[in-house]
């Protein structure tokens, strides 16, 4: 730091801890009054005590004993396990943040997370076992993939996905029993294996441009009653496919619209579903057989 001397000039000043009073970093606070005494003269000012440590843009340490954290703008990435098992209610992620590492919030008590528009990448298992997390608004982010196991066993009730999203990873919403409805963005072309397996969804809106819905993507969703399509996007992919057993074990399913881009249906697509009364199949789909709609015999 610099000091202004009696001659009116500013020069560097060396300050020791003995010359500082009122400062404590034991508890994070928004405002703390600090006084510096040099040669009998005092100067007081306010400082902010951050609950985190940041090195070269990476979040490296989080202090305990807080309920809410607002990350400073200097954070560019959150590393693996950063908030794992933490007892925290709210985290405000800063504008400028680019990525969040594997299992960053694994088994934490977080209830609310504010996501920035600058976020581009999520890694796997981020919100695994986050029972208290009820809503995730990712709609303003720039992520292109929701990775594998993002919300497994989370208490999520509402998820808003960004228009930039192109892929939903395997088991992304596995065992999310509180999730009731979801609209999948129009640019999504791939839905991974068991992406919504045993979730609580009742309705799903699929984009017409989707070309790959992996096996058991909606396997055993006991409350799923309606799968509809929307959007004008059409992908002319001869291999576009809904893979086997995608909707097997959805006993309440009554309406199923197959996206316009799909060409191939896997076997056992609607296995065990006896309440389907409305089925819409695009003209481009290859011949449909009995085994597509039922469990094959062995």
Predicted features along the sequence, with ranges:
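Serine/threonine-rich, repeat-prone extracellular segments and beta-strand-based repeat modules
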Residues: 9-45
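Conserved small/polar residues in nucleotide/adenosyl-binding loops
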Residues: 290-297
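Surface-exposed repetitive/solenoidal architectures
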Residues: 51-58, 77-85, 104-106, 128, ...
């Amino acid at each position: 730091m610099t000091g202004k001397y009696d001659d009116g000039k500013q020069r560097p000043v060396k300050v020791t801890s003995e010359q500082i009073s009122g400062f404590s970093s034991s508890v994070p606070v928004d405002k703390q009054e600090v006084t510096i005494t040099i040669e009998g003269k005092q100067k007081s000012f306010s400082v902010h005590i951050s609950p985190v440590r940041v090195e070269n843009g990476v979040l490296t340490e989080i202090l305990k004993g807080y309920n809410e954290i607002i990350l400073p703008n200097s954070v560019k990435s959150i590393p693996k396990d950063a908030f794992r098992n933490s007892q925290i209610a709210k985290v405000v992620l800063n504008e400028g943040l680019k990525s969040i590492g594997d299992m960053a919030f694994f088994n934490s008590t977080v209830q609310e997370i504010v996501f920035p528009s600058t976020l581009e990448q999520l890694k796997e298992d981020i919100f695994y076992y986050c029972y208290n997390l009820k809503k995730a608004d990712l709609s303003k982010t720039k992520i292109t993939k929701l990775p594998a196991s993002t919300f497994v066993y989370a208490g999520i009730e509402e998820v808003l996905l960004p228009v930039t999203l192109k892929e939903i990873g395997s088991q992304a919403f596995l065992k999310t029993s509180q999730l009731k409805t979801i609209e999948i963005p129009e640019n999504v072309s791939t839905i991974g294996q068991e992406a919504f397996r045993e979730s609580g969804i009742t309705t799903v809106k699929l984009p017409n441009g989707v070309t790959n819905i992996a096996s058991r993507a909606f396997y055993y969703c006991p409350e799923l009653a309606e799968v509809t399509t929307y959007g004008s996007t059409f992908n002319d992919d001869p291999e576009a496919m809904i893979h086997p057993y995608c909707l097997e074990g959805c006993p309440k399913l009554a309406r199923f619209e197959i996206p316009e881009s799909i060409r191939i249906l896997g076997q056992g697509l609607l296995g065990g579903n006896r309440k389907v009364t409305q089925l819409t199949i695009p003209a481009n789909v290859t011949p449909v057989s009995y085994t597509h709609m039922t469990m094959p015999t062995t």
